[in-house]
């Protein structure tokens, strides 16, 4: 079957397929536009649109029995269904990439114990792409040669070397801007200042507290190179409640308006439970806010996020949240975050992909403390890893990988920095998605600037402020 197969989404099918036939329009369909003018015969030519490109593929595969063939057909149908268009490549023509998604039904022509399968694809992006390549910015300049036949949308990966108020990418015809340049007479300020960065690889500065919400403190917490983990949860105590180890530490300074980031892992196993909690305490040890992730269902793999305000005995606000697609937070390797700015609280939950991108994000809900009940300065943090007695959660299932706390500075009359040393932008001009350290931040884009394509031929791109940024531009050449 060498040279007769295909890949979809840069992966081969779950078993060998042979492409028997394919129908592809070798040139993307062109639809002419005409403008009808009353009183004038006919119409006036008004340019054209490039239509979608359909692809029909006929494949077959081997099976030992009719039932095995039908089972494989079900697997194949599920494998081809994707949320978004993905690269489709035929091994007979490896230099051509189609951004395709399955469309319509899968048709079969059954012969004996097996048969042929017809799969229909649609390419809403009708262009044919070639391989991806990158060009580095050198002292703020990138010379990009686009050998494709049409313009192509670039992806920029930009690393921040020093604090910036703006990021500009431009040519002699177009510009793209994030943030705002600061005139020399304007004040430039940091919106937030990092006051705690604890990798949780050591127990230094951490002590064992005496109280925990809705349960008991027991067992042992250890610091590993991956973060805090529970090696034991303690013997069951009656009446049964949530139990496990907890640790507490002071912040280097008390903080009023703040943001806290806590990356965690909570991996689900059926018939097990698990709970990770982070408390934000005032100087007297009262709980001001608490955020967590938990699996409280012993018969299901199901995680939910939670956010609570106040001590457990007089708590007036409890918020529980599942992902928009409920299983998406299972085997959670992601971020818990708390904001407090003025009297506005906002929790944040997100899975983090291996490439650092935040997905299945929940950040829309917020709470304004009109009664000012939860406004005391934050002086301490407490963490807990717990389970329900009788469930067999193991050490490897739960982990707190670190905690960072920033102080929000009062806005000054001036222009804020939008990024600092070590931050990374990824700007996908094709999708319009902009991420800063994996989080979508389209709000930074200057309203009057535009995403622009790389024209065929030689292109000169400029990156400013070039002494504070480094990066590269990535393109895929394409043709009709």
Task: Go through each PLM region and give its residues.
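Broad, structure-driven detector of short, well-ordered beta-strand segments within folded domains
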Residues: 288-300, 336-340, 383, 425-428
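Extracellular Ig-like/FN3 beta-sandwich strand-entry sites
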Residues: 83, 255-257, 331-333, 342-344, ...
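Secretory/extracellular carbohydrate-interaction modules
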Residues: 193-314, 392-399
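Beta-strand-rich interaction surfaces with strong enrichment in secreted/lumenal proteins
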Residues: 44-46, 108-109, 245-252, 320-328, ...
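Short, aromatic/His-centered strand-loop micro-motif at the edge of beta-sheets
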Residues: 304-337
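Flexible glycan-contacting loops in extracellular carbohydrate-active proteins
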Residues: 359-398
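Extracellular/virion structural assembly segments
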Residues: 1-194, 267-286, 393-399, 403-480
